Every structure is written in structure tokens, then in C-alpha cells.
A protein has these predicted regions:
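Flexible "cap/lid" loop of the alpha/beta hydrolase fold
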Residues: 147-190
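Hydrophobic, aromatic-rich cap/lid helix
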Residues: 216-243
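Post-His helix in hydrolase/transferase enzymes
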Residues: 269-271, 278, 294-310
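Serine-hydrolase catalytic-loop signature spanning alpha/beta hydrolases and amidase-signature enzymes
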Residues: 88-90, 98-108, 120
């Protein structure tokens, strides 16, 4: 994103008969042209400049696009990701995000995981760039994506980490039957600031007003991308994810993390999920709501790091973020 800063230049003054000849009544002034580069990639919404939280701004500045080949087409799509600062030949850790969210929800936990010696990529790139079993992390609806992927591509997933998992909903339910016009109306309602403020207050415990407003604005940035509405409507009418029948098919060792004060998904479902998975452990985080990796990043980072390194060589891992 570039901005131009032009100093004022005196306009040409025409002679009495408007002959088109310039009359030098004023001294010439030198044109001063400055180009100011934004700290953010040009494809991100300009509203990102208004975000106050330093860690959100820092992570956003690292987002870039890479081509991802499609199996059903000769073309590639450009997918956004945060690339690793360093790349090592080790086990990747892949971070998904929840529904109606973005990779910025990992802004607090990602730096801690990197400090622990973990790297960053994105799940979209597995077949093209990773090509080895990974530890897949899915928060909220991202947990349904993780389970579906682990069951259908077991060769790609070594371990699972599910955070406040939304895995028992029957897809998008009756929303799948909505006429497209009504679906678009509902999607645009999701953009409203009052609704998003309410959702943020439900997701986190006791946020100060200025933090709640800034976090709400961070959570709304993806709405400003031109394809967001179409993609969300397509997801709604597709029926969404319904993975409850797949849970018992998961063979990978799984860590379940849950905020004890989750007001969006009942934490009793954590116990149910633990009982239905073949090989799982469960850890609950006190005084924490629906998004522990934002609210309690140190606790989540510690749990993830210990789980990734358990039963494997203690060393640097690869962390992948989408």
C-alpha cells in the first residue's frame, strides 16, 4: 500500500490573451514526492492500520500469499499464510482457525510457540510444501475440519489437538435451506459491530471496553475482503461440517484443551469428546472462555509444546499457521 505526499505547486498563469504561453509571475518550486510504504501487505484491508494491539499488527505484517495447486484443475489459487521464520526438517505443527475467523486468532500464542522452537506454515500447503505427518491443531469449528482431515487423510496427520471443539453440531442445520438472498442478508448481519461486540464479550472473560473493541475489530477484518460474503454463503448452503460420526474413527493420539468458562460450547462436551476418542487426554484451563489461545496463550503454548514433544525426540519442531 503506497501513499503519495505532494507539496503544493503553483499553477501556470496564462497571459492576458490566453495564448497558452506561461508567464513566470512566481518562482518555480521543486516537486517533493514521498512514498510511504505500509507495514502490511497490500492485499489486506486498509482498516488494519486502525488496529491498536501490537501483536496483531506484527502477525498481520507477516501474512503473505503463496500458490497452491488444485487437484481438479491445472491452475493454482493464491492462499494466505504466515511462513516459518526458519525451516527445519522436523515434524510440522499446523494451526487452523475457527469459523468466521482468521489466522490472527493465533496472534498471542504463536510467538510463544516460536520461542519454544516451533515454525509456521499453513495446512493448505501440506501436499505441496510439507509432505510429512503433522500435528494438526483445530480450535472451535476448526476442530471439525481437523477431525475430518485426520480421518480422510491419516497419512498426513500424526497427532491432533482440539481446542474448545465444535464437533457435535449437525452442520449448518436449517441455514442450508435458506434462499440465497436471505443467506446473504444473514451474512451481512454478521458484520454488524453490536453483534460482534456481543460475541466477543461471550468468548472472553471480563475484557476492558477498549480491549473488547479492538479485539472485535481484529475479528472483523476478514469481513472486508471482497470474497468473504460469497464464501460464507457457499459454506452455509453446503451444509457445513457434520463430523460426529467420524469421532470414533480418529486413530491419532489427541489432546483436548478446553476453557472451563466457555459460554459458547458447554465444557461437558469436552468430557463426551474424550470418552469417544480412542486415544485422548483432556486438559481444562481455569478462568478461561471459548478461545484459550487468545485469552490464556502461555497455558495453551505450554500444553501444545509438551504434547508435541511427548514420545518424540525433544528438539525443534515446525509450526504451521493458516
Amino acid at each position: 500500500m503506497l501513499t503519495a505526499n505532494l507539496s503544493p505547486v503553483a499553477p501556470p498563469v496564462l497571459g492576458p490573451k490566453a495564448t497558452g504561453k506561461l508567464m513566470n509571475h512566481r518562482p518555480k518550486r521543486k516537486l517533493n514526492f514521498k512514498v510511504l510504504a505500509s507495514e502490511f501487505p497490500a492485499f489486506l484491508p486498509k482498516e488494519l492500520e486502525n488496529i491498536k494491539e501490537p501483536v496483531a499488527r506484527k502477525l498481520a505484517s507477516r501474512i503473505e500469499r503463496l500458490p497452491v495447486p488444485l487437484s481438479l484443475s491445472k491452475t493454482s489459487i493464491m492462499s494466505s499464510c504466515v511462513k516459518p521464520k526458519t525451516q527445519l526438517d522436523t515434524t510440522p505443527l499446523v494451526l487452523l482457525h475457527g469459523f468466521d475467523s482468521s489466522c490472527l486468532e493465533w496472534r498471542h500464542t504463536l510467538p510463544l510457540l516460536e520461542e519454544a522452537g516451533l515454525e509456521t506454515w499453513a495446512v493448505d500447503f501440506w501436499s505441496s510444501y510439507i509432505k510429512r505427518p503433522m500435528t494438526l491443531v483445530g480450535p472451535s469449528l476448526g476442530a471439525a475440519v481437523a477431525i475430518d482431515f485426520a480421518v480422510n487423510h491419516p497419512e498426513a496427520v500424526g497427532k491432533l489437538i482440539l481446542i474448545d471443539a465444535s464437533v457435535y453440531a449437525e452442520g449448518t442445520g436449517n441455514l442450508a435451506k435458506l434462499p440465497k438472498l436471505m443467506a446473504y442478508a444473514g451474512v451481512y448481519l454478521l458484520k454488524s459491530l453490536p453483534l460482534r461486540l456481543y460475541a466477543t464479550s461471550l468468548a472472553f472473560n471480563g475484557l476492558p471496553w477498549d480491549t473488547c473493541l479492538d479485539w472485535t475489530n481484529i475479528g472483523r477484518l476478514h469481513y472486508l475482503l471482497p470474497w468473504w460474503a460469497d464464501a460464507t454463503v457457499d459454506f452455509m448452503i453446503s451444509g457445513g461440517y457434520n463430523v460426529s460420526a467420524q469421532i470414533e474413527q480418529v486413530k491419532q493420539k489427541t489432546l483436548i484443551i478446553w476453557g472451563e468458562n466457555d459460554q459458547i460450547i458447554d465444557n461437558r462436551l469436552a468430557v463426551r469428546l474424550h470418552s469417544e476418542l480412542q486415544n485422548a487426554i483432556i486438559r481444562q484451563i481455569p478462568d478461561c472462555g471459548h478461545i484459550p489461545h487468545v485469552e490464556k496463550p502461555a497455558a495453551v503454548s505450554k500444553l501444545i509444546t509438551e504434547f508435541v514433544r511427548a514420545e518424540s525426540k525433544i528438539g525443534t519442531q515446525r509450526l504451521i499457521l493458516s
